[in-house]
Amino acid sequence: MPLLDSFTVDHTIMKAPAVRVAKTMKTPHGDEITVFDLRFCVPNKEVMPEKGIHTLEHLFAGFMRDHLNGDGVEIIDISPMGCRTGFYMSLIGTPDEQRVADAWKAAMADVLKVTDQRKIPELNEYQCGTYHMHSLEEAQSIAKDILDRDVRINHNEELALPKEKLTELHI
């Protein structure tokens, strides 16, 4: 099995909250695709609660588009990581990390402005696979934590696992 890019960085020294360019690629038609690691929690030390991350998934996708789309950028998808420590965001374009961090903070401020659980988008059995598993309170707690701690930038060259470590891990 090929080694995925996300497993070549050292999660023991990864900072959070932080933005990291996880991958860049060019389509056959020349479009630039960038995948960002939006790390909400320090790996193996913190985790987002399942109801909170699910609610955040519904809110974050729209709010990030409000603040980041335009000027050569269009978000394709924002999805939570299985480990519940962050989200991956795939987009067309190559915005710098600070632009992404600023949009992320603005989106978190928007989450804090949601006044009622009934205002969560697509919160019904037709549009959500587990529509009972939501918590606006938990999502807002996550958003407040991001704003209180601020968002930094994780650089791949600082997080790269040495080849010796990858060999030791039998990868």
From Swiss-Prot:
Fe cation binds at H54, H58, C128. Coiled coil: none annotated. Binds 1 Fe cation per subunit. Its cofactor is Fe cation. One of its GO terms (molecular function) is S-ribosylhomocysteine lyase activity. It catalyses: S-(5-deoxy-D-ribos-5-yl)-L-homocysteine = (S)-4,5-dihydroxypentane-2,3-dione + L-homocysteine. It is an enzyme of class 4 (lyase). One of its GO terms (cellular component) is cytosol. Keywords: Autoinducer synthesis, Iron, Lyase, Metal-binding, Quorum sensing. GO terms for biological process: L-methionine salvage from S-adenosylmethionine; quorum sensing. Gene3D superfamilies: S-ribosylhomocysteinase (LuxS). Its EC number is 4.4.1.21. Belongs to the LuxS family. Involved in the synthesis of autoinducer 2 (AI-2) which is secreted by bacteria and is used to communicate both the cell density and the metabolic potential of the environment. The regulation of gene expression in response to changes in cell density is called quorum sensing. Catalyzes the transformation of S-ribosylhomocysteine (RHC) to homocysteine (HC) and 4,5-dihydroxy-2,3-pentadione (DPD). Homodimer. This is S-ribosylhomocysteine lyase. It comes from Yersinia pestis.
